[in-house]
């Protein structure tokens, strides 16, 4: 080959090298830009993931809060229903206590009356009928008599007025009822006054 051809080949090689270097330089700028965008995207993704986790935590907290509030409302509703039920049951408590002396007086009148006297018989029948009607009416509202004669003594239901020895009764048994007790819907409003065997 001639010198001239060598020069042309060398020039062509130089131009080709320059073009490759230029392409590499252009590629390098694009790579740098792409890497910067990738880094920015990764940071943005990390921020979004953190925000998502925080939002999920808040949602879970709100759900727990709602569940607690629902449970509290349910408990309050249940307590209110129980209190209303109790108020209905025992609203008559004081009124029933005031009626007990009337029942006692009617029973005393029946016991004191001479059933053999013809003049007293119609009056006695009227008092007995009044007593029966009165007791029936108050029993409809949950008032019940406590008459524990012969039963074991129970301090929740009975009030011991005296204790006596008795060979005919077991120890700690009610021998005699001095005054009947009464309960209203399972709650004692007046304990029975009793004599207990020793």
Curated annotation (Swiss-Prot):
GO CC terms in record: cytosol
GO BP, sorted A to Z: protein folding
Main localization category: cytoplasm
Region (Disordered): 1-20
Keyword field contains Chaperone: yes
InterPro entries to which the protein is assigned, alphabetical: GrpE, GrpE_coiled_coil, GrpE_head
Protein family per UniProt: Belongs to the GrpE family.
HAMAP family recorded: GrpE
Summary of subunit composition and partner proteins: Homodimer.
Protein name, as recorded: Protein GrpE
Species: Vibrio vulnificus (strain YJ016)
């Amino acid at each position: 080959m001639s010198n001239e051809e060598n020069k042309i080949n060398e020039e062509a090689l130089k131009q080709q090298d320059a073009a490759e270097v230029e392409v590499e330089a252009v590629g390098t700028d694009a790579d740098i830009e792409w890497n910067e965008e990738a880094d920015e995207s990764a940071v943005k993704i990390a921020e979004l993931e953190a925000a998502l986790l925080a939002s999920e935590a808040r949602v879970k907290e709100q759900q727990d809060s709602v569940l607690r509030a629902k449970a509290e409302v349910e408990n309050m509703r249940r307590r209110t229903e129980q209190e209303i039920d109790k108020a209905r049951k025992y609203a008559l408590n004081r009124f029933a206590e005031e009626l007990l002396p009337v029942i006692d007086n009617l029973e005393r009148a029946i016991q004191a009356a001479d059933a053999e006297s013809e003049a007293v018989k119609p009056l006695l029948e009227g008092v007995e009928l009044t007593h029966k009607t009165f007791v029936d009416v108050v029993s409809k509202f949950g008032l019940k008599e406590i008459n524990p004669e012969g039963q074991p003594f129970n301090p929740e239901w009975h009030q011991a007025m005296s204790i006596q020895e008795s060979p005919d009764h077991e120890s700690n048994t009610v021998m005699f009822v001095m005054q009947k007790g009464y309960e209203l819907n399972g709650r004692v409003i007046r304990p029975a006054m009793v004599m207990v065997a020793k």
